[in-house]
Curated annotation (Swiss-Prot):
Stretches in topological domain Cytoplasmic: 1-11
Lumenal side, ranges: 32-626
Keyword Transmembrane in annotation: yes
Domain notes for this protein: There are two conserved domains in the glycosyltransferase region: the N-terminal domain (domain A, also called GT1 motif), which is probably involved in manganese coordination and substrate binding and the C-terminal domain (domain B, also called Gal/GalNAc-T motif), which is probably involved in catalytic reaction and UDP-Gal binding.
Protein name: Polypeptide N-acetylgalactosaminyltransferase 5
Chain positions recorded as Mn(2+) binding sites: D268, H270, H404
Membrane topology summary: Single-pass type II membrane protein
Length: 626
């Protein structure tokens, strides 16, 4: 009898913890308020832990950096004074949004930044503490977080969309899309504004989900506060956590892998979508699943967060230069003639890469992104070439507008030792550019280094039956200047001083209307790589050396000669400006360029291109008399 009682007691002791464990598992499975995907810090487990250890759950009210969490219930006489929630201890998180916090206000016309207006912060009038906060926001984000935190995450945007877009009719049976937003330590107000603009301006029947891909953020507001805030959307917003810092390309691929929508729409984490942005994109894909579409990208000022809306007539299309850098240019005349309305979708040779929609199955058929690409850079051109050369179409849709915060620098830190953009670009060139790859290699002084195995990507191109890059240039981007037509190219060296000085653009590739200077020759190409066209232009891809009577500048090439026409004599080394008849020289210390009267024996007017094709110069009549 005693033995029987002992066995019974033992069974009870064993069954009680088993019962509680099963209960916890059941409640965790049925309380899926935060749609966290593959996370190591599941929200349900955190709430359970907080309830078992109440002191651990204490959290201060957060303003501007995360959602305020409702305070702990008051415990008196071991009794919790709160309304009982279904699901026991695993109750859904509650939110106590501070009504005085400007970022959560909705529908207040007097709110800062409404209708996309600028928020101007006079830093000189801030207290020492507020100045420190202002500076920290700038340092962490490379945009004015202080101004952003004064603007509602629900703010309204300009309503001056093109009138024709307001009456445009779209297919009634459009596919559903997953919107994928990758981020790393994005500012709270900016990230939430991006998400809310998607949720509030996309018809619910078209929005499958929003997938937030966290690329291993380490700021507190991107962790539990973000999970708890997004749980209010009932599974519409999901969070995917990367287990290590992977970069934009791999983060996007992970997002695509879990997305369930028929169409994938990619956005950056510092965007705002305008009303009616989604329907025009999905309509084009509905008509042809091999069409990849981009919205018009409006500029959100990185300092004031003013939304600059552009009209359809001024839509630009994407291009690239032989440094394999993306650029914008106006719609070519040949395409403009084929359009009946300014709001008609327009073909684009390339995409900027941050904002676009693509049929998921078609994306997979194209091989998604090159898995050998690291971090970011070059993926937009790879996808653009692949779309056009392998039977698809790439368009910009003027009735779809999304604002984007364009920063002047990147706030992110990466491991050093490898030029990631260069490595990605070499892989791109090897697979897609055919013999034209030499034009890129000349710009990096033919220093290729280790770019990995590309055999699988070449096989992909072969299996897809893609066209040649020459076909792409002839049919999709005939406006691009081809370096093979150059009379001379490479560095432009002057040896009057030592070390020798080279003509140097001294600005970023996309910066124009800036002075040209000289710098010690470095042999790396880049800012010192120039081309002399058959028309006498000294080109840096789409920029030309221009002289209008004051400084020697780089301006966008206009193809009309004039101030951009130069006559080069390789024998004497003179670069003579056709209009002014002056010659390009430099000061005695080699520090500055100057335009002076031509003198045959002046070594400071003696310039040598690294490569010169005399036969081509004679052929095009580009060789002036000595």
């Amino acid at each position: 009898m005693i033995i029987f009682k002992k066995k019974a007691i033992l069974k009870v002791l064993l069954l009680v913890p088993v019962f509680w464990i099963c209960s916890l598992i059941f409640f965790a499975a049925t309380s899926n308020d935060s749609s966290q995907i593959g996370s190591n810090n599941d929200l349900a487990n955190k709430i359970a832990e907080a309830n078992f250890h109440p002191k651990a759950a204490k959290q201060d009210v957060i303003q501007g950096f995360g959602p305020p969490i409702e305070p702990e219930p008051v415990v008196e006489n071991n009794k919790v004074e709160e309304e009982e929630q279904p699901g026991g201890n695993l109750a859904k998180p509650k939110f106590m949004v501070d009504p005085n916090d400007p970022i959560y206000k909705k529908g207040d016309a007097a709110q800062a930044g409404e209708l996309g207006k600028a928020v101007v912060v006079d830093k000189t009038k801030l207290s020492t503490e507020e100045k420190a906060k202002y500076d920290k926001g700038m340092l962490n984000n490379a945009f004015n977080q202080y101004a952003s935190d004064m603007i509602s995450v629900h703010r309204t945007l300009p309503t001056n969309i093109d009138a024709e877009c307001k009456t445009e009719k779209y297919n009634e049976n459009l596919p559903r899309t997953s919107v994928i937003i990758c981020f790393h330590n994005e500012a709270w107000s900016v990230l939430l504004r991006t998400v809310h603009s998607v949720l509030e301006r996309t018809p619910d029947h078209l929005l499958e989900e929003v997938v937030l891909v966290d690329d291993f953020s380490d700021m507190d507001h991107t962790k539990r506060p973000l999970e708890e805030y997004m749980s209010q959307f009932g599974g519409k917003v999901k969070i995917l956590r990367m287990e290590k810092r992977e970069g934009l390309i791999r983060a996007r691929l992970r997002g695509a892998a879990v997305a369930t929508g028929e169409v994938l729409t990619y956005l950056d984490s510092h965007c705002e979508c305008m009303e009616g942005w989604m329907e025009p994109l999905l309509d084009r894909i509905k008509r042809d699943p091999t069409t990849v579409v981009c919205p018009v990208i409006d500029v959100i000022d990185d300092n004031t967060f003013e939304y600059h809306h552009s009209k359809a007539y001024f839509t630009s299309v994407g291009g690239f230069d032989w440094g394999l850098q993306f650029n914008w240019h106006s719609i070519p005349e040949r395409d403009r003639k084929n359009r009946t309305r300014p709001i008609d979708p327009v073909r684009s040779p390339t995409m900027a890469g941050g904002l676009f929609s693509i049929d998921k199955k078609y994306f997979e058929k194209l091989g998604t992104y090159d898995p050998g690409f690291d971090i970011w850079g070059g993926e937009n051109l790879e996808l653009s070439f692949k779309i056009w050369m392998c039977g698809g179409t790439l368009e910009i849709v003027p009735c779809s507008h999304v604002g984007h915060v364009f920063r002047k620098r990147s706030p992110y830190k990466w491991r050093t030792g490898v030029n990631v953009l260069k490595r990605n670009s070499i892989r791109l060139a090897e697979v897609w550019l055919d013999d034209y790859k030499t034009y890129y290699y000349e710009r990096i002084n033919n220093q290729l280094g280790d770019f990995g195995d590309i055999s699988s990507r070449k096989k992909l191109r072969e299996d897809l039956g893609c066209k040649s890059f020459k076909w792409y240039l002839d049919n999709i981007y005939p406006e691009l200047f081809v370096p093979g037509e150059s009379v001379a190219k490479g560095e432009v060296r002057n040896s009057a001083v030592q070390p020798a000085r080279c003509l140097d653009c001294m600005v970023g590739r996309h910066e124009k209307n800036r002075p040209v200077g000289t710098y010690q020759c470095h042999g790396q190409g880049g800012n010192q790589y120039w081309m002399l066209s058959k028309d006498g232009e000294i080109r840096r891809d789409e920029s030309c050396v221009d002289y209008a009577g004051s400084d020697v500048m780089v301006f966008p090439c206009h193809g009309m000669k004039g101030n951009q026409e130069w006559r080069y004599n390789h024998d004497t080394g003179r670069l003579q400006h056709a209009v002014s008849q002056k010659c390009l020289g430099m000061t005695k210390d080699g520090a500055k360029l100057e335009m002076v009267a031509c003198q045959y024996d002046d070594p400071y007017q003696h310039w040598k291109f690294k490569e010169y094709n005399e036969a081509k110069a004679i052929e095009h009549g580009a060789k002036p008399p000595s």
